[in-house]
Amino acid sequence: MKKTFIFILWSLFSVAVNAQNFNDYFEDKTLRVDYIFTGNATKQEIYLDELSSLPKWAGRKHHLAELPLAGNGEITMKDKATGKTIYRTSFSSLFQEWVSEEEANRIKKGFENSFLLPYPKKEAIVTISLKDVYHKVNASLTHEIVPNDILIHQRGTNLSLIHISEPTRRRGIS
């Protein structure tokens, strides 16, 4: 009985120690990352297209470093200073389905893909990888996110910044 109690107490403690607080690493904003997946049946490549900032984060705020589902692609975000994984997610893309088609043996194509990630407070390293049906990585790209980079486009609207005036005043009508 004593061993069971100690084991349960130790388990609860280890879960609490490993729990990650969303606000420690992320702003309440969304980072939209646009990639282009290109290639054919034998070779695939990933290119970073654009980074955008959106006003709110509507995704999960718990179990951020855990992979929720298995897919044929994966995105991992790590804190640059510590190397700690702070966010992971998986996906399946139309490009990876197309690669298995007969057409992919004859021509190369590119597919646009957009992913929504929590907006990091500090510099982060993002790795995106595409996997085959055996979960072997076919292509990957690692790039840095600098949160205050002027090349991250501001998108969406923050309703608190919008000023709504009376229509009659704008037209000069009394």
Regions found by a protein language model. Give the residues of each.
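Extended acidic/polar, glycine-enriched regions
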Residues: 107-161
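Single conserved hydrophobic/aromatic residue that forms the stacking wall/gate
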Residues: 162-174
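N-terminal prosegments of processed precursors
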Residues: 20-113
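Residue-level signal for short segments within beta-strands and strand-turn junctions
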Residues: 77-79, 130-132, 166
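Intrinsically disordered, low-complexity segments enriched in Ser/Pro/Gly/Ala and basic residues
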Residues: 10-13, 72, 173
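Residues that cap or initiate secondary-structure elements
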Residues: 39, 81, 121-123, 132-134, ...
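Residues embedded in well-ordered secondary-structure elements
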Residues: 8, 64-66, 104, 117, ...
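Bacterial Sec-dependent N-terminal signal peptides
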Residues: 1-22
